[in-house]
Amino acid sequence: MHLLAPLALTTKPSPLTYTSKSSNALYQRRVAGKRSALKTSKLCVRAIDAAQPFDSEARQSIRAREAITLKIGIVGFGNFGQFLSKRFVADGHTVIATSRTDYCSTAVELGVQFFKDGDDFCEEHPDVVIFCTSILSLESTLEEFPFQRLRRDTLVCDVLSVKQFPKHLFVQRLPKHFDILCLHPMFGPDSGKGSWQDLPLVFDKVRIGEGDKRQERCNHLLRFFETQGCRMVEMSCEEHDRQAASSQFITHTVGRMLGTMELSETTISTKGFDSLLSLVDNTYHDSFDLYYGLFLYNENASTELARLELAFDQVKSQLFCRLHELIRTEHFGKDLET
């Protein structure tokens, strides 16, 4: 728009000011110059295309944020459930929990929404449900849990220290439209109280339904542990139990034996002895139900316990055989020579 055009057309030189032809010509030239400047000037308008809620870009952005944030339900809000929840919340995930014991105050401190009633818990429709119960109570918990109130595509996980047992229960008891992921973080509140760097996380994708959404959800949950520094190990539940019997069960057994001895630090403790005390700290404070579950629900544990007992007897036998030889030599040395 030429804002000065009307003004220029209606403005006439004052007879008092422009009395001569030369003055009038000068005035006309000035007006013409202003008109020319207006014709050549351009109005530049710059604007940022801000995403609106109804834009496709905005919807894609919202979906992207939702894709990396999970609503995770914890069933069994004891020490291990609280241990995992704290990390999930710190990573930006929404965590809800339910348990037979009332942990409302603890949940508030951790930023977790706690539900006393399992039905109310399921009505929140978590993306992932993780059973953090004890090994011994898993079966009874599954019998009482209202799975029918969950969404049909819910991902169900466990973090038990044995894997074949929960796998079989899930396959037998859960509706077929549920996804199943068996997990075992090979650490706990004591051994994992600091960094999770290089700590093993064993997983078995027992049943993950078709569709990008289901695959991405499962992978994103696993990616959480990976970004925390865990060493990711994909392994069948059967192979896990075979290896765990000769590693985890033996570790807990030796730790409990040493804990029963009430070992304590001395002024001349060696690094080896400090390692034994660390083993006691990482195992002896776990509940006996956990240790008993490792024995009862791993079919390989009895064999490893027998091997441990046999190895101890062999070492003790070597000691006493050498001692008996020494005693015989001292008391019957001359007779033995003849």
Residue spans for each PLM region:
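Internal alpha-helical scaffold of NAD(P)-dependent oxidoreductase catalytic cores
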Residues: D198-Y284
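Short glycine-/small-residue-rich Rossmann-like dinucleotide-binding loops
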Residues: C132-I135, L160-S161, V206
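Interdomain hinge/lid region at the active-site interface
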Residues: S264-T338
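NAD(P)+-binding Rossmann beta1-loop-alpha1 motif at the extreme N-terminus of oxidoreductases
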Residues: S41-K116, D120
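Rossmann-like NAD(P)-binding element
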Residues: A5, K116-L155
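N-terminal chloroplast transit peptides
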Residues: M1-D49
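Rossmann-fold NAD(P)-binding glycine/threonine-rich loop
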Residues: L155, V159-W196
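Hydrophobic Val/Ile/Leu positions in short beta-strands of Rossmann-like dinucleotide-binding domains
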Residues: G73-I74, F131, F203
